[in-house]
Amino acid sequence: MQILAERLIELRTQKKVSRREVAVIVGIVERTYMRYENGERDPDAPVLRKLADYYDVSADYLLGRTDVPK
């Protein structure tokens, strides 16, 4: 899902954190997070929820269902 990948990169860049930092916070390995950002893999529901909470946006925003972050 390309929009998810783009939004993850954008949000991480805005927050000025590394992929590794985000991965540790949401409880996944860095390689898995890289795959999310590369559009090679989509997170499961629990990880998607953790990412949305960490970036303080809705899961719908991450998935491209809305352009309103919250």
Predicted feature residues:
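Short amphipathic helical patch at the helix-1/turn junction of helix-turn-helix
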Residues: 2, 13-14, 42
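Short basic helix-loop element that most often maps to the first helix and adjoining turn
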Residues: 6-25, 50
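Conserved hydrophobic/aromatic packing and binding residues within compact polymer-binding modules
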Residues: 8, 22-23, 33-36, 62
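DNA major-groove recognition helix of helix-turn-helix/homeodomain DNA-binding modules
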Residues: 27, 46-61
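Recognition helix of helix-turn-helix/homeodomain-like DNA-binding domains
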Residues: 27-42
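DNA major-groove recognition helix of helix-turn-helix
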Residues: 37, 55, 66
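Short, basic-rich loop-to-helix N-cap that marks the start of a DNA-contacting helix
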Residues: 40-50, 69
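Short, charged recognition helix plus adjacent turn
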Residues: 61-70
